[in-house]
């Protein structure tokens, strides 16, 4: 049984140590905690709790709150217990006004990174960023010639199907739904429910991008270092326009220590949330950022901008220079031109009735004081042969990755579904002969059914395998190669001669040669 009075004192010490609880607020906060835990009085004598000050994450305390809520009929199940624990940490966390004031002060006095450190660490220590759960994700790098892919098996976020994402994008806004979606500003401090994750402990800071009101928060899933989400304060759909480029660079002006990018505004080639305009960024050098130019080009209209087609798997253009305004102008021209472009000789079909072309732009401030804009060209057309998308992961790779390839993965950081962790172990058992496998008898309901073809091929090539580590290495190699092929699938202009000529034809329409 959890001692509630003892728990209250531990939470007070924790909040004073990590969540900026002031001495003058200690009695007030203790009474708030007593009320929440349904206690009438605190401990008469407070024991030594210095060990609390050594904590690096709040997991133990969060779990104690959950246990206490179940033991004392405050919560009837795990979901309610989680919501309650998050609400307690929300109570312990500074109010949004205080957070914004401190963030602005630190940014002005100590710089952008100090301000970001403050908000990030607060979000870890109030359990919004669930650092322990994130640390369980599997992560490795794959070097492929001049390029490197970062591959993670995500154990904290469920896999989404493209068809579900399309339904969400087209769904009418329900006036009764509150908050309207997971990105709306009304999430800040929201208790949550059985269908909505707890957001009592969420804190954001306000930004102005393109003259509009936006907010910044950190991602609870944190796919990379200081992974942040930047969202419009109004519930408005994703859109890809010239103004998108301007807003990305407005963000870079505020936080030059981060990159920032926008998912595209169309299903299949966009992110999982299309009904609320948002960007993603953070303090991480993405694999695509390390890619070298394949070709260097020039613009007649913007001679001060360095232009290159990247030596990368998908169709990416890099613009760099010291003049942010000319980069924004040229970037806007590329976005507008691509949205209206067609070239049926390479399968790029676009029409006024149904637009298929869009972009994935990413802005950065480089160490040599140059501005950088990378634009990945995207197309979401479907056919009978490829009903999930011509420039999407082809069906033979869906056993590894079926979700749309959004901003993060298009830059070479793969987020693979958590189901793969167990399935890799099971496939290793089969390859080593420790588990039976008969492709003719495997049922569609079997989790390994989706891997039937891959397992058969791997067994044929490695018939007498008895080294488990070797088996795991073989499976991982297959996953690595699949990730490369998926990115190649997303390229609207393939890297062969035909694709390269087609790419340059498009750029010629902008007088880029």
Residue ranges and their predicted role:
Residues 211, 220-223, 227-265:
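Secondary-structure-rich domain cores
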Residues 216, 260, 277-279:
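Hydrophobic faces of well-ordered beta-strands that scaffold small-molecule active sites
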Residues 1-237, 311-314, 328-331, 337-513:
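Active-site microenvironments that recognize anionic phosphate/pyrophosphate groups
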Residues 226-232, 270-286, 376:
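Histidine-centered divalent-metal-coordination microenvironment in nucleic-acid enzymes
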Residues 243, 252, 256-272, 281-335, ...:
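Catalytic or ion-translocation cores adjacent to nucleophile or general acid/base/metal-coordination motifs
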Residues 267-275, 353-358:
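Beta-rich nucleic-acid/ligand-interaction surfaces
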């Amino acid at each position: 049984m959890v001692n509630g009075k003892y728990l209250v004192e531990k939470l007070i010490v924790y909040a004073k140590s990590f969540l900026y609880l002031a001495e003058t607020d200690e009695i007030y906060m203790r009474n708030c905690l007593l009320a929440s835990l349904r206690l009438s009085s605190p401990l008469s004598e407070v024991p030594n709790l210095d060990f609390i000050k050594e904590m690096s994450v709040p997991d133990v305390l969060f779990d104690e709150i959950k246990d206490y809520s179940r033991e004392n009929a405050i919560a009837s199940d795990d979901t309610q217990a989680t919501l309650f624990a998050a609400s307690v940490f929300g109570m312990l966390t500074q109010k949004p006004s205080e957070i914004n004031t401190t963030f602005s002060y630190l940014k002005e006095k100590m710089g952008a990174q100090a301000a970001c450190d403050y908000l990030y660490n607060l979000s870890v220590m109030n359990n919004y960023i669930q650092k322990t759960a994130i640390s369980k994700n599997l992560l490795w790098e794959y070097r492929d010639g001049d390029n490197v892919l970062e591959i993670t098996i995500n154990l904290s976020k469920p896999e989404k199907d493209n068809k579900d994402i399309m339904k969400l994008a087209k769904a009418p806004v329900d006036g009764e739904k509150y908050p309207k979606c997971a990105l709306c500003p009304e999430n800040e401090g929201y208790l949550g429910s059985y269908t909505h994750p707890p957001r009592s402990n969420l804190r954001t800071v306000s930004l102005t991008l393109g003259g509009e009101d936006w907010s910044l928060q950190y991602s609870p899933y944190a796919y990379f270092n200081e992974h942040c989400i930047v969202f419009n304060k109004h519930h408005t759909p994703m859109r890809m326009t010239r103004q998108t480029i301007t807003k990305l660079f407005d963000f870079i002006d505020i936080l030059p220590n981060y990159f920032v990018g926008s998912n595209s505004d169309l299903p299949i080639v966009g992110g999982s949330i299309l009904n609320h305009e948002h960007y993603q960024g953070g303090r991480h050098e993405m694999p695509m950022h390390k890619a070298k130019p394949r070709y260097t080009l020039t613009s007649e209209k913007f001679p001060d901008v360095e232009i290159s087609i990247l030596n990368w798997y998908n169709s990416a253009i890099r613009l760099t220079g010291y003049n942010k305004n000319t980069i924004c102008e040229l970037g806007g021209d590329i976005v507008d031109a691509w949205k209206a472009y067609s070239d049926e000789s390479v399968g790029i079909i676009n029409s006024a009735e149904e637009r298929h072309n869009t972009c994935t732009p990413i802005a950065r401030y480089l160490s040599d004081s140059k501005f950088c804009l990378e634009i990945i060209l995207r197309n979401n057309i479907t056919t009978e042969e490829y009903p999930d998308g011509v420039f999407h992961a082809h069906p033979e790779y869906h056993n590894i990755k079926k979700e749309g390839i959004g901003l993060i993965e298009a830059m070479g950081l793969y987020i693979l579904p958590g189901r793969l962790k167990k399935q890799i172990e099971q496939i290793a058992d089969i390859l080593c002969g420790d588990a039976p496998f008969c492709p003719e008898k495997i049922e569609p309901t079997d989790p390994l059914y989706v891997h039937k073809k891959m397992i058969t091929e791997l067994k044929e090539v490695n018939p007498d395998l008895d080294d488990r580590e070797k088996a795991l290495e073989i499976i991982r190699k297959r996953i690595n190669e699949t990730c490369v092929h998926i990115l190649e699938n997303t390229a609207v202009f393939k890297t062969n001669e035909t694709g390269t000529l087609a790419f340059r034809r498009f750029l010629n329409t902008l007088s880029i040669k």
